[in-house]
Amino acid sequence: MVLERVNGPADLRTLSPDELAVLATEIRDFIVQAVAVTGGHLGSNLGAVELTLALHRVFESPRDIILWDTGHQAYVHKIVTGRRDAFPTLRQAGGLSGYPNRAESEHDWVENSHASTVLSYAHGLATAVEEAGAARRVVAVIGDGSMTGGMAFEGLNNLGHSGRRVVILLNDNGRSYAPTASRLSQSLARLRSRPGWVNLQGRLEQLMLEMPGVGELAWSGLRGAKAAIREVFEPPVFFEDLGVRYTGPFDGHDIGRVEEALRHAAAYDGPIVVHVLTQKGRGYPPAEDDDEKCLHDAPVFDIGTGPPKWAPAGYTEAFARAMVEIGERHPQVHAITAAMPGPTGLLAFQERFPDRFHDVGIAEQHAVTAAAGMAMGGLRPVVAVYSTFFTRAFDQANLDVGLHELPVVFALDRAGITGDDGPSHHGVLDLALCLQIPGMTIFAPSSAQELGVMMREALERDGPAAVRYPKGMARQVGPEEVGRGLEAKCLRHAAPSGGAGDIAILAVGPLVQ
């Protein structure tokens, strides 16, 4: 096997094109087999095999700094940087992290798994590299929906303004968890649909740049003409309007083509985007056939049949059911998600009430302030978000919702410890943050039935409310154990014989179990 000969990035540079093609197939098989045993992110990594191999053949990590946005597409990076043998412990206690991890390897620089941050990291690191006069490049890999986040645009704007030497590899698979929602993604989709025109343009650009002495000058002279042509033949490439050079799109599964583009980008004196088109879930039929999320993430599964069709479970399932029931009775209720309609349990609501469902992309801050605007206009918005991602929009929840005493409901899924999702996904801050928001009422259901009651009560309140519930299964209880959400209920009573007892144990939420 070629894979057994790859113990570090340098080994990739010794391989022939034919060996690289074999290696890509072997890596896909390895990832499917590993994730089938432990669970993990599948579709994103199957789509990032060739671009990762090209990256490590062109750039010399860790001398060159390779940054991964979100990080769930970095399994191939881990495999080729010496961690292949640790994959049986993927996402296990004390084992291999599901995201880049600084403690694991010198090849990992950032380890958060929240999206749209990498361009800001890249700007800062490129500033430090330039000041030190170091002969190293900074490469930022972003995509899989992350370009819908506002922070990515802030980083892009500052890169263009500063002129820092950063190579941005845009992995465009058209999706995050679900098909990406943004005008940018629509523009990129139109580019994807005209590969003939785009490939001709890309080859012409590279030929001009290779002309001795006059290549860069000729390119500069053609930019005005290209801009005019774009207005007619393709959507404006807004990257260049921000001062960031753009090249592509290229076939992200053609290692040689991606390598060639990256080598030219590495020589460019400024920020540059290399746009590659990839297929999420490539090479594994169950992932390719999964129209909803291309097996973005998967539990333990049988390789022959693939994971069972995903459906919300436990508290998330109870929330999904409650939202549809509430939506039937209250036409003013709207649901908002930040690129996670399936994981937050809103697919059924989306199907039943498409005009009252809003997927804003990876944009939690916008989601919360948009909900504030809806509430001002008389609607009753529900923002469904993981607890860990709610922290990204605390300022908006505090000022735009709380200060205005607006009736916005936050459905905070994955509250508490989330196990194999890792430290960046633990929902341990939402309770402390919600307590600081003016007028906030916090609900914590202890059963599936109580979640439904609390959602209805939260929507009846005149100010902000949060319903927080954990990952995993929910208790199923009878009506005798379901009270009103803001009333304590005595579930058990045990006093000494003949005595009243002077100790009361108060449990909230899942602690009731």
Descriptions of predicted regions:
Residues 173-319:
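Long, well-ordered, tryptophan-enriched scaffold segments
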Residues 260-263, 293, 314-329, 345-351, ...:
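Glycine-/acidic-rich phosphate or pyrophosphate-binding loops and their flanking alpha/beta elements
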Residues 1-81, 238-262, 267-278:
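N-terminal amphipathic, basic-rich helices that act as targeting or association modules
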Residues 76-82, 123, 147-156, 178-183, ...:
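Short acidic, glycine/serine/threonine-rich loops at helix termini
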Residues 116-127, 347-348, 365, 369-372, ...:
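Short, acidic loop-beta-alpha module within alpha/beta folds
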Residues 84-100, 161-178, 196-199, 358, ...:
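A glycine-rich helix N-cap at a beta->alpha junction
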